[in-house]
């Protein structure tokens, strides 16, 4: 049975005989979190409003470990800055996860009607930092900090959500080296699969600060695979434009390529940008009202179009990815990762369902593999670095997994350029 591992493995699992449909009234769909759909609901025993994430375990069989991880982390958290978890119920193959309802939207939603001012940015960042300070003190790493995973209550309280890729450090394991997160927000050391710790969240926070200021992360116009190559290679992004010096310095402090030079969350709470600008969270209710007005106007415009296909996006627990450039890479078998496979989130997979899948590049077997075998052989003979050759080969296969056919395109472009180069006499000096 698809759900047997979950029955024995989830903390907070309620009496299996209890019927969640009797205990809770499921209301409208309010978003899509990691692994499942999220609904507003009522706890019939207390009349309390809750968020209900419903996951079909038969459809999500491959993600059961990730689901367990999210629930395990949430069940261990007790902080006003982290989404509260109330328990889980199993009915047939459906897992009901009951969580705190946060009706103010995500920080990403709040950017939709227009830019934020620096007081709003500082207030949101301060609350994220409080959540990170708590998690890091518990030796937990969120690993997917971004505006979409920051949720607000209707009163302006700010909480971290979507713990599907969160990691736990132990006393003996002070660093991790797994490749998870969302490409645009990923720290260089995570992409390189070097050992990393809670400072990876600080890098992601710096990217989130740019996102809150500009509406999108750096490189959002590029394919995520390209970004994975650029982040470790390039200088850190900076916040360009008409922003205060303290905000630019806050971003710069977070985005140091050397993790040990990044401040801790506790230290950043004392940064002058936060101290000078952050206000009480009730100040954010103005932003929430602005978003609700904007959404109502959008709904009115959309309803006038018969072929409109817009989905309600009011957030509750679980976060939601609403940009083409937002997807989360989840931890999988390290052996698979070495072979270049990449696991996209449910959202990205759903987006790709209607797109005819291109076949994998023929050149992988006819050109790429033989070429790398030859390179390795030559490198071994002269005592070269096999690791860098394998890393390059892995990167090509990783790109192919994300974008089938890209290797054939790359080889064709290379051939064309070489032909143009030789015709223009570029190779004359070689003769």
Curated annotation (Swiss-Prot):
InterPro entries: Kinase-like_dom_sf (IPR011009), PDC10_dimerisation_sf (IPR046409), PDCD10_N (IPR048288), Prot_kinase_dom (IPR000719), Protein_kinase_ATP_BS (IPR017441), STE20/SPS1-PAK (IPR050629). The modification N-acetylalanine is found at residue 2. Pfam families: PDCD10_N, Pkinase. PROSITE patterns: PROTEIN_KINASE_ATP, PROTEIN_KINASE_DOM. Coiled coil: none annotated. A motif (Bipartite nuclear localization signal) lies at residues 266-280. GO terms for biological process: cellular response to oxidative stress; cellular response to starvation; execution phase of apoptosis; intrinsic apoptotic signaling pathway in response to oxidative stress; negative regulation of cell migration; protein autophosphorylation; protein phosphorylation; regulation of axon regeneration. Residues 24-274 form the Protein kinase domain. Its EC number is 2.7.11.1. Its cofactor is Mg(2+); Mn(2+); Co(2+); Zn(2+). ATP binds at residues 30-38, 53, 100-102. A motif (Nuclear export signal (NES)) lies at residues 323-374. SMART domains: S_TKc. GO terms for cellular component: cytoplasm; cytosol; FAR/SIN/STRIPAK complex; membrane; nucleolus; nucleus. Residues 297-325 are annotated as: Disordered. CDD domains: STKc_MST3_like. Mg(2+) binds at residues 149, 162. The modification Phosphothreonine is found at residue 178. The record marks 313-314 as: Cleavage. The modification Phosphoserine is found at residues 4, 308. One of its GO terms (molecular function) is protein serine/threonine kinase activity. Belongs to the protein kinase superfamily. STE Ser/Thr protein kinase family. STE20 subfamily. Monomer. Interacts with CTTNBP2NL. Interacts with RIPOR1 (via C-terminus); this interaction occurs in a PDCD10-dependent and Rho-independent manner. Interacts with PDCD10; this interaction is required for the association of STK24 with RIPOR1. Part of the core of STRIPAK complexes composed of PP2A catalytic and scaffolding subunits, the striatins (PP2A regulatory subunits), the striatin-associated proteins MOB4, STRIP1 and STRIP2, PDCD10 and members of the STE20 kinases, such as STK24 and STK26. This is Serine/threonine-protein kinase 24.
């Amino acid at each position: 049975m698809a759900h047997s591992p979950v029955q024995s493995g989830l903390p907070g699992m309620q009496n299996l005989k209890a019927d969640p449909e009797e205990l809770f009234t499921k209301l409208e769909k309010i978003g899509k979190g990691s692994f499942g759909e999220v609904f507003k609901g009522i706890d019939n025993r207390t009349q309390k409003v809750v968020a209900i994430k419903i996951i079909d375990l038969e459809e999500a069989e491959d993600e059961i470990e990730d689901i367990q991880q999210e629930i395990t982390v949430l069940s261990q958290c007790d902080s006003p800055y982290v989404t509260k978890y109330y328990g889980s119920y199993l009915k047939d193959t459906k897992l009901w996860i009951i969580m705190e309802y946060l009706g103010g939207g995500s920080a990403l939603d709040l950017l939709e009607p227009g830019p934020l001012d620096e007081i709003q940015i500082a207030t949101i960042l301060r609350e994220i930092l409080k959540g990170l300070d708590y998690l890091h003190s518990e030796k937990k790493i969120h690993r997917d900090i971004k505006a979409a995973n920051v949720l607000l209550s209707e009163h302006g309280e700010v909480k971290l959500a979507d713990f599907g890729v969160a990691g736990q450090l132990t006393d003996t394991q002070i660093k991790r080296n797994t490749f998870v997160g969302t490409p645009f927000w990923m720290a260089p050391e995570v992409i390189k699969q070097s050992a990393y710790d809670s400072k990876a969240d600080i890098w992601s926070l710096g990217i989130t600060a740019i996102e809150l200021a500009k509406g999108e992360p750096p490189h959002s116009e590029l394919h995520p695979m390209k970004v994975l190559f650029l982040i470790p290679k390039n200088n850190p992004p900076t916040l360009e434009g008409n922003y205060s010096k303290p905000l630019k310095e806050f971003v710069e402090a977070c985005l140091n390529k050397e993790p040990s030079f990044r401040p801790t969350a506790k230290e950043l709470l004392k940064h002058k940008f936060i101290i000078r600008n952050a206000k009480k969270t009730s100040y954010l209710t103005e932003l929430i009202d602005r978003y609700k007005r904007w959404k109502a106007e959008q709904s009115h415009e959309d309803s006038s179009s018969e072929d409109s296909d817009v989905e309600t996006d009011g957030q509750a627990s679980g976060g939601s990815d609403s940009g083409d450039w937002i997807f989360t890479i989840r931890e999988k078998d390290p052996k698979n990762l070495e072979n270049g496979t990449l696991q996209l989130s449910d959202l990205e997979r759903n987006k790709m369902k209607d797109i005819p899948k291109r076949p994998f590049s023929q050149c992988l077997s006819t050109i790429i593999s033989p070429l790398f075998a030859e390179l390795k052989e030559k490198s071994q003979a002269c005592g070269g670095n096999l690791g860098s050759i394998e890393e390059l080969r892995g990167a090509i296969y990783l790109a192919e997994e994300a974008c089938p056919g890209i290797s054939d395109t790359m080889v064709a472009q290379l051939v064309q350029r070489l032909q143009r180069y030789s015709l223009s006499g570029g190779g004359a000096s070689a003769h």
